C-alpha cells in the first residue's frame, strides 16, 4: 500500500520513508475476516474507492512534550469525494470519527498487559481548525498523555498535506474491568 498512487506525493513519501515508522496495517480495503464485525464501519462502509481510498497505520516516536510513553499512533489516509459534507470538503463529523479511531488505537496499544478487550471512549472533545479538502491526504496522529487506573487520556491531531492543522482532540478512554473469567479465557 505504500506504493498506492495517492501516496506518491513528496509529502506522503517523506512520512512513509521515515525509518522510525513501525507499520501495522497496509491496506486499500478489506483487512478483516468476513465473519467478524471488528471495525465493520471502516471495513464495509468507509474503505471504498470514493471514501478512504487507501490507508497506512503505523507507530513512531512522538515529539510532543506531553507524550506519556514517547510514541504515537498514526493513520495516513487518502480521502475521496464520497466523504464530502459539501462539494470539495470532507464532512466535519468524519474528523471526529478518525480521531476516535486513531486515539482509540493509541489507547488500546498503550494499555499495560494483559490486554484482552479494547478500552471504550468515555469523552472526546474535537476542535475543528481547518476544512479538509477532498480528494486529499491527511495524517492523523495520537499520543497518550496520562494514565490513572483504568482511565487513559489521549490527544490527537489531523493535519493535511498543505501543512494545515485541521482538527485537534482530547479523549478519555476507560479500560474494561477484567473478571476472573476474562483472565481464564486468556490462558
Feature roles, as predicted:
Residues 1-134, 146-187:
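Terminal targeting signals and extreme-terminal segments of soluble enzymes
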